[in-house]
A protein has these predicted regions:
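C-terminal charged capping/lid subdomain of soluble metabolic enzymes
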Residues: 105-231
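Catalytic cores of large soluble enzymes that bind and process phosphate-bearing ligands
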Residues: 5, 9-16, 34, 57, ...
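Short acidic (Asp/Glu) and glycine-rich catalytic loops that position anionic groups and cofactors
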Residues: 1-4, 21-26, 46-52, 70-78, ...
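Short alpha-helical scaffolding segments that buttress acidic/His motifs in well-ordered protein cores
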Residues: 39-53, 95, 178, 200-205
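Acidic catalytic cores of enzymes that act on phosphate-bearing nucleotides/polynucleotides
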Residues: 47-104
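Short runs of predominantly hydrophobic/aromatic residues within well-ordered alpha helices
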Residues: 17, 39-45, 66-69, 88-92, ...
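Carboxylate- and glycine-rich phosphate/diphosphate-binding segment that chelates Mg2+/Mn2+
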Residues: 1-63
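Flexible, glycine/charged-enriched surface loops at secondary-structure junctions
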Residues: 33-42, 59-63, 80-89, 107-114, ...
Length: 231
């Protein structure tokens, strides 16, 4: 978002969050035992990310694409009168999905970006009558990526892929940490069925007016669901 849209970024804030995450990761194995040090680290991480959000004046230090996917799953379930499992459990599962997709993007040929062309009738159909009005408020009179020069996406693509490689742990490493902490890793463990799971990956991007890598993918004709499923 900083590279493509000029959004605020502060390395000191990012470092604050990194340190908190590194400590939490080092104590993952102690979480299931309700270890006092691990519990303290969890609380400290929550507080530090809260401070980071205050400093950045946005939720980015603690909330990315994985949170938006989780919100999509939750909102869709609510339209059917179903209360979801804990938000954090779904965010964890979505984190594995997003990390997998992002690392796979780096193995694809470098794309050439263009203005996006969205089938809004298809999007509205998947959001349904209950969610569409609020969803469209984030996408009218223009979308967030209408403010991005496609040439810049093409120009910065390699740099973005390098950041992914350096900053985001591999899916294998994340699964190891989740296993140590006894955290949910599959859609079945959070009661998200196959159709809802797949729709969340593909359609969550319209639920917020926020630049993410996933939100930019329509500009380069990449379907994240196809990337995730290896198609």
């Amino acid at each position: 978002a900083a590279l493509l849209h000029g959004d605020y970024y502060c390395e000191r804030v990012a470092s604050l969050v990194r340190r908190a995450l590194e400590r939490m990761a080092s104590l993952a194995a102690k979480v299931p035992a309700h270890d006092e040090e691990a519990a303290a680290a969890i609380m400290e991480t929550l507080v530090l990310t809260g401070i980071a959000m205050q400093l950045a004046k946005c939720t980015r230090p603690a909330s990315g694409t994985e949170h938006i996917i989780s919100h999509y799953w939750e909102c869709k379930k609510l339209t059917h009168g179903v209360i979801s499992d804990y938000h954090g459990k779904k965010v964890g599962v979505a984190t594995l999905v997003v990390a997998d997709i992002y690392h796979k993007l780096g193995k694809l040929p470098k794309p050439v970006a263009h203005p996006e062309h969205i089938d809004w009738e298809d999007v509205k159909q998947h959001y349904g009558p209950e969610l569409t009005p609020d969803m469209m408020k984030f996408n009218e009179p223009n979308t967030i990526v209408d403010e991005i020069d496609p040439k810049l996406v093409t120009e910065k693509w390699d740099e973005i892929m390098k950041i992914i490689d350096e900053e985001i742990p591999s899916t294998e490493r994340l699964r190891e940490l989740f296993a140590l902490a006894h955290a949910a890793t599959t859609p079945e463990q959070i009661a998200v069925d196959r159709d809802l799971f797949r729709d969340g990956i593909r359609y969550h991007i319209f639920m917020r007016r926020r630049v993410t890598i996933m939100r930019v993918l329509p500009m380069v004709d990449i379907d994240p669901l196809n990337v995730y499923e290896g198609k």
